[in-house]
Amino acid sequence: AYDVALLEAKGLPPEVWPAPRHDDTLRRYRRLCVAERAFAQSVVSKLAARPRAAAKTRAGVQPRPSASVVFCIDVRSEILRRHLESALPAVETYGFAGFFGLPLEARDADGEATPLCPALLRPAHAVVVEPGPKSSAAVAGKLLSALRKAAAASFTYVETLGLAAVYPMLRAASGHEAHGPGCAHAHEHHDVSLEALRPEVRVSLARGIVKNLGLPRDPGRLLVLTGHDSTTTNNPQAAALACGACGGHGGGLSARVAARLLNDAEVRRALAAHGQGLADDCVAVAAVHDTATDLVRLLDRGLVPPSHQGDLHALEQAFAAAGARARAERAPHLPGLTERDRSDAAALERCLTRRSADWAELRPEWGLAGNAGFLVAPRERSRGANLEGRVFLHSYEAARDPDGAVLELILTAPVVVGSWINLQYYASTVAPDAFGSGTKTLHNIVAGVGVLLGNEGDLAQGLSLQSVHDGEKPRHEPLRLQVFVEAPRARIEGIVARHAVLQQLLDHEWITLYVLEDDGARATRYTPAA
């Protein structure tokens, strides 16, 4: 109205008035803000119902847990954690970035290095993976794979050896190809050498794990470090389903290294000398959560002493029960499942295992579709709350972090990476032509660095259509990341003031931050300074 009055006062005729700008954009922006506020309110209302559990923990009346299980902060872990705590109430769970704070790279016998840390970091240390003697078939397979991916030789490969791929394709299509755990996840069972890590480095890495996790001195008799991976076949975007904190690789190797460090006798003595000692009967165990099937594989079982085998068996049974419940929760959202597939727990497990090994399956799982929140708080704040697999969960105890160093690390690393993941799903959903990578059925891998759609065009970026859409409607609800932090407001403000990356995310509204106060009963939206 003000603009119209001004134009009339200037004597300009209506036909030269500028058209209303961005009306549709503003309407969509308002709807986005309303949807984000509704999601944030739903999370806060669920958290507000659990203040008494947190108060009990701070009062120190909670008994020692039967096991302490560390999961990755990945939203898919939320479902399994919730069901594990239901199946085994005496268990205690933590959320931590799936590389467990270890900036490592894995080197194989040929000297090839694979980074196992987030893109924000550069590997500072190396571990050597020793797969043992290679068969002639394995060597030949590696050579053929390199030939197939070479820029120029790939054409010759197709012309001369393309027909040889017919039989393996027919076997895969008929379901007779070997895709068992021993085949798809053989790296989880290779020997790992920590000889390249000097004693002081091992101690430093272990101290970081204990400090950043906020572990008490008496965690459970089993301290289970659970990485995650996804079983998928013929999928150029398999890295999007693996662990982002491990550089798009599986988290099994990082979990194994972390467990070895925490079980090392010299490291234990050094931890005790620094006031970070763990109970003498606490044994660290490595595990992997397969997010496609919700099966949990326990690694290096032979390193667990006989005195703890009973504890391990009980935990394994709880993992099995939790996995069955998690599969049942996810099943209604997976396209293509029949009533027969969902008829009972065993049938559903077989179905999801078969889907993960099916080279023609476009949606073996939904990955992080639906992600919208990031919670930085003690687990007692959210334990028992159904967050629907939409929230990253990072454990944090403000009382154990008086100088704010741990919180600063969380806000500047995992939260930033979480915003990247969230924006990747957001952009691939709202603007798939510009920021997605089209349909998987047309993907052609180019030199192992990206995909083309068919045989022309530029490298496609972002997620495939099948990663965010079920064929009828979007599976991912595009919301910007809502971050909830239970910590003193002054501490949060100080951290934001020191880091431009956080100021950019908050000032430009790529993320929204809420400060949880009064035992989670109240959430105050953080407003950047003008």
PLM feature spans:
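N-terminal extension/subdomain marker
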Residues: 1-196
